Swiss-Prot record:
Keywords: Cytoplasm, Lipopolysaccharide biosynthesis, Nucleotidyltransferase, Transferase
Major site of localization recorded for this protein: cytoplasm
Source species: Teredinibacter turnerae (strain ATCC 39867 / T7901)
The enzyme's E.C. designation: 2.7.7.38
Taxon lineage: Bacteria, Pseudomonadati, Pseudomonadota, Gammaproteobacteria, Cellvibrionales
Protein name: 3-deoxy-manno-octulosonate cytidylyltransferase
UniProt-listed Pfam families: CTP_transf_3
NCBIfam families: kdsB (TIGR00466), PRK05450.1-3 (NF003950), PRK05450.1-5 (NF003952), PRK13368.1 (NF009905)
One Gene Ontology term from the biological process aspect of the record: CMP-keto-3-deoxy-D-manno-octulosonic acid biosynthetic process
Family: Belongs to the KdsB family.
Annotated CDD domains: CMP-KDO-Synthetase
GO cellular component term, pick one: cytosol
Keyword Transmembrane appears in the UniProt entry: no
Length: 258
């Protein structure tokens, strides 16, 4: 299995400025993500950034990094620039590991690449995991996914999907019964993707769709254009990424900093 990992890392963040360079156990967060990716079976790991400070930090720890445009409307557009700079072939597989996932397991990176490689009908692959807390079900920052019987994604949403009409009608929306009954089929989408390079070149030519603009979920553009995303349950726990100062504190606790 041959694949490359690209780690998009933007310095600007409304909720956590300078996020890639926030220190965890004395190292910038982006270095932890890079090291996780290096432990996978990837033939190459490269950071894609639009900020000189991130570029310098990555070169400082000996990592591979590319400078990209600051004008990209989405992370997928940034990936397309990277594969163009690297002159990768249409059939090659790229795994997009988010730059705010310092605890991403290497085996999960391998899994999503293998998932795409073994599903020729899919143009992309991603992962999910069961939701076990009702607060996650109703949290719009926790993206949910529903799939068909072949595990191709039907839809991604910030809303609680699927909605069990009968259980909610019986127990209401604040009952502990909801987790064991109404949400046994509810899956949290894990934001790691494997793409065939050809899809990335197509993606940047498509306009954003109505549902993508409503949900603010760019993966919906792939489904809207008739292509398939294959989804598997992750083979290992994937701790949430770092979006807020509270998330950063949680990760620092996991590293023993606090």
């Amino acid at each position: 299995m041959s694949f490359s990992v690209v780690i998009p890392a933007r310095y600007a963040s409304q909720r956590l400025p300078g996020k890639p360079l926030q220190l965890i156990s004395g190292k910038p967060m982006i270095e932890h993500v890079y090291n996780c990716a290096q432990r996978s079976a990837a033939s190459r790991v490269v950071v894609a950034t639009d900020d000189q400070r991130v570029f310098d930090a990555v070169t400082g720890f000996g990592g591979d990094v590319l400078m990209t445009s600051a004008e990209h409307p989405s992370g997928t557009d940034r990936l397309q620039e990277v594969v163009s700079q690297l002159k990768l072939g249409d059939d090659e597989i790229i795994v997009n590991v988010q730059g705010d996932e310092p605890l991403i397991p290497a085996e999960v990176i391998n899994q999503v690449a293998r998932n795409l490689q073994s599903n020729s009908a899919a143009s992309a692959a991603t992962l999910c995991e069961p939701i076990t807390a009702f607060e996650d079900v109703i949290n719009p920052n926790v993206v949910k996914v529903v799939c068909d019987d072949q595990n191709f994604a039907h839809y991604f949403s910030r809303a609680p999907i699927p909605w069990d009409r009968d259980v909610y009608a019986k127990f209401g929306t604040h009952s502990a019964n909801q987790i064991s009954t109404a949400h046994s089929a509810t899956r949290r989408h894990i934001g790691i993707y494997a793409y065939r390079v050809a899809l990335l070149h197509q993606f940047v030519l498509w306009p954003s769709g109505v549902l993508e603009n409503i949900e603010k979920l760019e993966q919906l553009r792939i489904i809207a254009n008739g292509l398939k995303i294959h989804v598997q349950d992750a083979c290992a726990e994937v701790p949430g990424g770092v979006d807020t100062p509270e998330d950063l504190s949680r990760v620092r606790v996991r590293f023993g900093d606090i």
